[in-house]
A protein has these predicted regions:
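Class I (Rossmann-like) S-adenosyl-L-methionine-dependent methyltransferase catalytic domain
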Residues: 1-73, 77-133, 149-160, 169-263
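Short catalytic micro-motifs in class I SAM-dependent methyltransferases
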Residues: 144-148
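A conserved beta-strand element that flanks and buttresses the S-adenosyl-L-methionine
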Residues: 141
Length: 263
């Protein structure tokens, strides 16, 4: 059947297919690439180190985020999930890669953090309405997942935040920064579809992140209410190798809060 597009999900799946299979980092089809990436644990990859993001640590130390129910998107070897669990969060952590989750479970067992629930699969499917991880969550955290999404999947990502984040809850992420000292592709969205690839991940300016996430509104018959507000947006601190925290200045760190009255 060739005329099978009826829904937004059908359109999104169709657009996924505009990218070369080897470019896939966001669906279950990309799991084998991530498995190969995590296969050699001795590689000098900064975020392979078992230490949390410096921005996440700062949010917690400053009291901006209180312990509650947390969802981590693209948890990798589990370093941030472990940190959250150690501070009293009830954690669900998702990743596409069986290899990454095997490593994360080993770390959790060693740390005595057996309460973390690790989930294998596509975060969009796992958090769909009536799915196991539908929320609500007090914190949704993403350290390096968002910048591996093609432009059209921002729609899916925003829908995930809207349905899974609790009123008054926080969303935080780190992602590639455009400009001097940054990392990632700065090609326009339209060119990505022409080339059929994401070129290692997408770089964003601070204003582009604000455009995607802050000032989002929800309209009713009588009013239009902002449902996501910016708390902080800055470059990640450059943490020394001996630091107990992870930090690389080619990344943005961002924290947003969902309005308390929004369901």
């Amino acid at each position: 059947m060739d005329r099978n597009v009826r829904t937004t999900d059908d359109v999104l799946a169709l657009m996924d297919g505009l990218f070369a299979p080897e470019a896939d980092r966001w669906t279950t089809g990309g799991a084998s690439w991530w498995d190969a990436f995590y296969a050699d644990r001795s590689k000098p990859v900064p975020f392979f180190a078992d230490k949390p993001d410096e921005n996440l640590d700062a949010y917690l130390r400053q009291g901006w985020i209180a312990p509650g129910r947390a969802l981590e998107l693209g948890c990798g070897p589990g370093r941030n999930a472990l940190h959250l669990a150690s501070l009293g969060f009830d954690v669900d952590a998702v990743d596409l890669s069986p290899a990454a989750l095997a490593w994360a479970r080993e770390r959790a067992e060693k740390a005595g953090a057996g309460s973390i629930r690790f989930h294998l699969g596509d975060a969009f499917a796992l958090t769909a309405a009536e799915a196991p991880l539908a929320g609500p969550y007090d914190l949704i955290y993403d350290s390096g997942c968002f910048h591996h999404l093609p432009p059209h999947r921002r729609i899916s990502y925003l829908a995930l935040l809207e349905r899974c984040l609790a009123p008054g809850g926080h969303f935080a992420l780190t992602c590639f920064a455009a400009g001097e000292g940054g990392m990632g592709s700065e090609l326009p969205d339209s060119d990505l579809y022409l080339t059929g690839g994401l070129h290692g991940g997408l770089a964003y300016t601070d204003d582009e992140l604000r455009h995607v996430f802050s000032g989002l509104t929800e309209a009713t018959e009588t009013t239009e209410t902002e449902w996501m507000e910016e708390v902080e947006l800055r470059r990640m601190n450059d943490e020394a190798p001996e630091s107990p925290l992870f930090g690389e200045p080619f990344l943005w760190t961002a924290l947003f809060r969902k309005a308390a009255g929004q369901g």
